[in-house]
Amino acid sequence: MRTVWTICLILFIVIIGFFGDLIWYGVQQGIGQAKIIYRAEEVSDVLSNANTPDSVKLKLNFIQQVRAYAQDSLGLNDSKNYTSFFDQEGKDLMWVVQACPEFSLEAYTWNYGFLGRLPYRGYFDSLRSAKLSKQLWDEGYDVDVSPVQAWSTLGWFRDPILSNMLDEDEGMLARLVIHELT
């Protein structure tokens, strides 16, 4: 039995050694997403709240119409995404870092294990995104750090409507919602 525990400990140390940064990044992302998902309110509750401005109610109803269109006319699955609402109180929630070599359009990519390589890295902490941006800049990359309006948990969780999404006109809002539902 002692041999089994020793092998497990060695495997654990090796996995942390090779994938520790990726695991820590995943934990940070999970915490950021969980805070938002946990604090989100049901759209039906927001719509029935007398204190909700009419402009917010109109956009929330529009998003529900876009969801129905995406399911009925485009054949997308009913994922229950965008059936809850998170008020950002005017603050950005997430920042995406993108980079490429100077004078190049070839994107720098990050390895996300079983998800593959992606040309961006997102953070729920602006200081972490700024730190990575500076590191890449110091390595000679052109870097862009941008706040994002929405993101997808790829069906793992029920993604909420973020209040800053409501700043978009109907055309852009429909595009954003359909994009995130696919």
Per-region residue spans from a language model:
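Acidic/His-rich structured neighborhood in mature extracellular/periplasmic domains
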Residues: 65-182
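N-terminal low-structure segments adjacent to metalloprotease catalytic domains
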Residues: 1-91
